[in-house]
């Protein structure tokens, strides 16, 4: 076999680079967290716990087996925050940023990998878009930290500076990690700031901006408020995001938070409608919410954010395409439509495939944990939705799980972040699709 063909066969596809890149960063993070300097007690943390924490950070989830604020030292927290930033931006984007800073030329293969990593439509302009992402990310995170600085410095003194920076990056990257400590062995998250408009509004804005996707930012910045000039995908993302914030917020407002004053009740309803779509912060006790509200939160966790964003989940566009396809079927139209444009049939197939994959992971993981740990299925469904949607919300069972159940959640977080289709494309890289067509036959549906 010629040497050139051997090199071509050995070359990794962009999808393989993405999944291996995430795995490599997770492993490195887990090893760093095992160092005695990473903990406040100065001991060595078991590998399964550091692997869980590193996976949760890189996959911007927020589920933890040890409290981030009290268990990990300043060094350990810095490692976790670095992993969150890398996971939020994407391993490939971070690697490309170092290449840009060093002045090296970006090859066509690297540009193609960057395109796949941020779900860009084409290779052209990808370097400009990467620069835009990096500048926008650090500017927004800086503004978020400055907005929260007064509240945290008031409560924590100079340590409030680190608190503001940590929570700004964690919120923008939709990670949900906090360093506010524990109360009665529970993780209160931001419940201590439920009445603080400054903290609530800042965190909500960071979550939404981080979750709508880098391409949508670019579209909005280029076309300003001229909605009619946005790409169809940007329009779909913005409208779907708005609906997924307002409708659940109305439901939560009427079902929960009766004891709160009107202003705090509205604030709590809005926050709890935004955070399940992959952020992981909470300003109320989640276990005290009604069963209906918890069910809605599970759906929101599975849906997640938008393509090419810091968020995970099935993505808002997947939901929108499935709903539009159902509407087209009811109206006897041949294809789904958005804003006067048809949706490609391949997109509908992809959306259906993603839905089936997430449901299989969601129910399969919950069933295993429920049987193995002898826990109620409802609590396990909440936890697995949080893991596969890379959310980080919990009803409190994650720290109690044994190693096999932790491995299940680690797998779900990883698959939820890199994306099931990325793994499929990586496995099928280099394989040619067959051109043969089998005879067609009708099958009755419904």
Predicted regions and their residues:
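Membrane-proximal intracellular helices of multi-pass ion channels
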Residues: 1-446
